[in-house]
Amino acid sequence: MLGKNRLIFPGEKVLLAWSGGPSSSSMVWQVLEGLSQDSAKRLRFVAGVIFVDEGAACGQSLEERAKTLAEVKPILPATGFPWHVVALEEVFSLPPSVLWCSAQEPVGSEGAYKAAVDSFLQQQHVLGAGGGPGLIQGEEQPPPPTRDPQSLARPPATAQTEALSQLFCSVRTLTAKEELLQTLRTHLILHMARAHGYSKVMTGDSCTRLAIKLMTNLALGRGAFLAWDTGFSDERHGDVVVVRPMRDYTLKEVAFYNRLFSVPSVFTPAVDTKAPEKASIRRLMEAFILRLQTQFPSTVSTVYRTSEKLVKAPRDGPAAGDSSPRCLLCMCALDVDAADSATAFGAQTASRLSQRQSPTPLTETRTPPGPCCSPGVGQAQGACRREDPQACIEEHLCYSCRVNMKDLPSLDPLPPYILAEAQLRTQRRSGTV
């Protein structure tokens, strides 16, 4: 897939998101093989691997998490790539800038790609002739082979672990937990990619998983974003592009590949492990698709081919671009209408707002409204004081994320960077910043 696609230019830094599962393990080993000198269509980018420890969100104890990391430790250095092990608790120390959509570099043309290949080969030839590092791309990675020798032995802060556990325990439904976990994981990987200079992120989503994801997202109200959620490339983040090179392989093909080439993998319990079939929308869609696949073997491929026909287009036309408002969580363009719009969603929003408004007493109508922020207090602290905090967050969310946020009783457990960015956007809209 990567040999045929010219999305990744020679010399680019690519971060491989490895979860320990079969698909992501197969992806890492195929990239390792593609970077070798014996490969027919040799890959020419610089790779790194990241592993996110999600044990706290799944209810694992410190001993269970340490056991998982002990299984991960010998696999990552064996790849020869720079690797990073991060805990999901680190989302509580992320800056609000992780939710900003940075400017995206223009896509290079066919001639630009060929020129980049020639320049890369010439540079490799000069390095080889000068007695520098070898020509094997996998052996000339400038970063060190590990992120931090103590990173595996140092557990995250206890306060952050408790905060993450409290956040996921407060979510009512498993569907909302799965979506929240995916969102926080994406934000953390995106921050690590930007911090270490990676311009691409590869995920191990297989054809089977993408077919399940397509049907799930349709049920979750994310139909407007299917091209980004299931496509080969996802450019919603701007400077970091998410690539899905495993989308042409089914889970069965991945299992055969891992068996034939002895690809190691690590089982890590997920938030829906041992959950019943009807516990969440994703679990229900997974059982539905896999059950159909056993009776009709073309089910997965048919759903997958449907996703290939989806076209990425801004909601307000090509002129909308990066200036259009984006969702605070999934970072897609907002797909909701205003309360006064002539749509079903607009009517529901207007009805909800009218129910929230309470009748104002006669004595209060004669009192002029005071300033939003009290004297001596910064604007950032009092901009949303007179508004419903839940409404301040909801106005910056897409339809699907709004539905999921209804399963979160309180906004207090959310990571600070999400609340800070929501407050900043509200102030910017009201003109206080």
Each language-model region and where it sits:
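AMP-forming adenylation/ATP pyrophosphatase catalytic core
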Residues: L7-V14, W18-S23, R42-I50, S61, ...
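Mid-to-C-terminal catalytic subdomains of enzymes
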Residues: S199, T203-L210, P245, Y249-E308, ...
